[in-house]
Each structure stands twice: as structure tokens, then as C-alpha cells.
């Protein structure tokens, strides 16, 4: 699986302007790649609904870019499945918690899925710990709700739960492992071909993502690792 993007979804900033020259370079590079390697899956854009919140005009340009690129990729490698990636919590209208807003289903963004009718699949990142304090708060249809809005194949390309959170959002390794069990249970009926935990080891990034690894730098075995691997 390969996922490529030309913007920072957190800031809405482009890596470089999407002018005629860079657009052509992106298209030619992507087509050349799938011709050469025929990947099973290739994605373009990461958390594009978050990108839209920051840069709505550039989001519309991305929608057009995806529509232009899709048939060229399928012509070059017909069996490659082409997709884009959404941020699930924001799609659901969950903007509260560590996002700093409010959880309000009326703010859901499910309609954005319709901007990509050609996509072979739709992918999501999911970090419920940013909006909920315990995995037990996740309703039974937390992931199955996706099926109410698309019949396409569904991928989970990022997932995570932190072991250490800011004040008021404390967690531990037991809670992290509990989320993994919940994630498996609540996605079972979706049968996602891809279900990915974001970090094997704790990354050197901002709180709270810095303790989302299945392992820290000095560990070879944790409750989260046991839950993920079934060992």
C-alpha cells in the first residue's frame, strides 16, 4: 500500500502550489509508479476533510485532481485499488475533547464521501481517544456507521490510543490494550482489508501521539502488543 499527498492536513498548507507544472508532475509521477509496480492499493490525500476545514478552496482543487488522476491510474494498472483518506472522528461530527470544539452530530461531514464517486475504496484514520475518555464510551456502531454512507470497501489506514494523556485525559497501558480489543470487535463486520496501527514504537512527536506506540523504545512486550498480535 502507498499513500501520497501534496498538502499538510493539519495546517491546510500545500507542499508546493498546485499549478499546471506541479499538477502535471504529480500525475506523471503517479502514473509511472503504478505502471512500474502495480501496487495492490494506492491512496491520494490524507485526512482530506481536515484539509477542507483549513483550506476549502484547495480542497476543491484536490477533488478535481483526484477525478483527473483516477482514470489514468486505472488505465495504467487496472487491478490497483485507488482511494482517499478521511479523518473519522471529524467526519462523525466529533470535534470536542482534545480537538477543542464540541461533539455534535449535526456537524458531521459524511457528505464529503460523495465527492469521490470513482474511488474504489474509502479509507479512514481513527483516534477515538482524542474525543472520548475511555474505549467503553464507543457505541456498538462506531465503525459500522460508515456502512450507512458507503457500500465501498473500507480501510483503516491509521488507528491509535495513547498510554499517557494530558490532565483530565489520563490513560495507561491497560486502557490502550482495551481499545485494541474494542477496535477489533467493532470493525469485525466491516471486514476491512487494511487495519493499521499507526505506530509500532512511540514516535518523537507532540503529545498525546508520543505514547501511541505499541511499544516504547525500551520495550519488547506490552499489553498493547499482546492485544494487537494475539500473543
Residue locations for each model-derived region?
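Surface-exposed cleft-lining segments at the edges of enzyme active sites
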Residues: 15-18, 48-59, 92-95, 124-136, ...
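An active-site-proximal structural segment forming one wall of the substrate-binding cleft
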Residues: 13-44, 58-75, 103-118, 177-190
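Aromatic-lined carbohydrate-binding surfaces of glycoside hydrolases
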Residues: 1-13, 46-50
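Aromatic-rich peripheral "rim/lid" segments of glycoside hydrolase catalytic domains that contact
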Residues: 12-15, 166-179, 186-231
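Catalytic-core region of carbohydrate-active enzymes that cleave or remodel glycosidic bonds
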Residues: 133-193
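Active-site groove signature of glycoside hydrolases
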Residues: 28-59, 83-88, 193-202
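Aromatic- and acid-rich polysaccharide-binding/catalytic face
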Residues: 30, 37-40, 44-46, 84-86, ...
Amino acid at each position: 500500500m502507498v499513500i501520497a499527498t501534496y498538502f499538510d492536513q493539519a495546517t491546510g498548507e500545500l507542499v508546493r502550489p498546485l499549478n499546471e507544472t506541479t499538477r502535471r508532475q504529480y500525475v506523471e509521477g503517479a502514473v509511472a509508479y503504478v505502471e512500474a509496480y502495480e501496487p495492490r492499493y494506492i491512496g491520494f490525500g490524507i485526512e482530506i476533510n481536515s484539509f477542507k476545514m483549513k483550506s476549502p478552496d484547495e480542497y476543491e482543487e484536490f477533488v478535481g485532481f483526484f477525478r483527473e488522476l483516477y482514470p489514468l491510474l486505472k488505465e495504467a494498472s487496472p487491478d490497483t485499488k485507488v482511494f482517499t483518506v478521511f479523518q473519522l472522528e471529524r467526519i462523525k461530527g466529533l470535534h470536542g475533547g482534545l480537538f477543542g470544539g464540541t461533539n455534535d452530530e449535526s456537524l458531521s461531514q459524511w457528505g464529503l464521501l460523495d465527492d469521490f464517486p470513482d474511488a474504489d475504496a474509502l479509507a479512514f484514520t481513527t483516534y477515538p481517544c482524542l474525543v472520548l475518555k475511555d474505549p467503553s464510551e464507543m457505541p456498538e456502531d462506531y465503525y459500522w456507521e460508515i456502512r450507512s454512507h458507503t457500500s465501498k470497501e473500507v480501510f483503516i489506514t491509521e488507528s491509535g490510543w495513547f498510554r499517557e494523556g494530558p490532565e483530565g485525559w489520563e490513560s495507561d497501558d491497560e486502557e490502550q490494550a482495551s481499545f485494541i480489543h474494542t477496535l477489533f470487535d467493532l470493525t469485525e463486520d466491516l471486514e476491512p482489508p487494511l487495519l493499521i496501527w499507526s505506530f509500532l514504537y512511540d514516535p518523537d512527536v507532540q503529545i498525546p501521539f508520543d505514547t501511541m506506540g505499541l511499544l516504547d523504545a525500551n520495550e519488547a512486550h506490552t499489553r498493547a502488543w499482546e492485544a494487537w498480535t494475539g500473543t
